[in-house]
């Protein structure tokens, strides 16, 4: 698989779980002989929600909530067949969304 690049995008709400999963992917790729570029931290997406506290009248009383989505980018350059097999068998945390492009 010379000249190919595998691009992996990871998303999670908790940055600690995201960093642990990223480190696990990097260690697996390096152990099988592939070159890794990254992890590159991408901008966080912050969604803010404003809701009324009470069900009836008091419009001035509100709560604000936010969800932060943390993202990382990895490039695996010139992956070997062993690298692809190891990445397919890798078991990552449940809270991490993974997108892979070859």
From Swiss-Prot:
Pfam families attached to this UniProt entry: Ribosomal_S10
InterPro entries per the UniProt record, alphabetical: Ribosomal_uS10, Ribosomal_uS10_dom, Ribosomal_uS10_dom_sf
Record keywords: Ribonucleoprotein, Ribosomal protein
Coiled coil: none
GO CC term, one of those recorded: ribosome
MF GO annotations: structural constituent of ribosome; tRNA binding
Role of this protein: Involved in the binding of tRNA to the ribosomes.
PANTHER family: 30S RIBOSOMAL PROTEIN S10 FAMILY MEMBER (PTHR11700)
Record family assignment: Belongs to the universal ribosomal protein uS10 family.
HAMAP family: Ribosomal_uS10
Official protein name in the record: Small ribosomal subunit protein uS10
Organism encoding this protein: Cereibacter sphaeroides (strain ATCC 17023 / DSM 158 / JCM 6121 / CCUG 31486 / LMG 2827 / NBRC 12203 / NCIMB 8253 / ATH 2.4.1.)
Gene that encodes the chain: rpsJ
């Amino acid at each position: 698989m010379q000249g190919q690049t595998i691009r992996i995008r990871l998303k999670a709400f908790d940055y600690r779980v995201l960093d642990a999963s990223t480190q696990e992917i990097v260690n697996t790729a390096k152990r099988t002989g592939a070159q890794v570029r990254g992890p590159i931290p991408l901008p966080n997406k912050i969604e803010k929600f404003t809701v009324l506290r009470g069900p009836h009248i008091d419009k001035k009383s509100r709560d604000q909530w936010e969800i932060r989505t943390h993202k990382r980018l990895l490039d695996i350059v010139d992956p070997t067949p062993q690298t692809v097999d190891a990445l397919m068998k890798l078991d990552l945390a449940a809270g991490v969304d993974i997108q892979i492009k070859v």
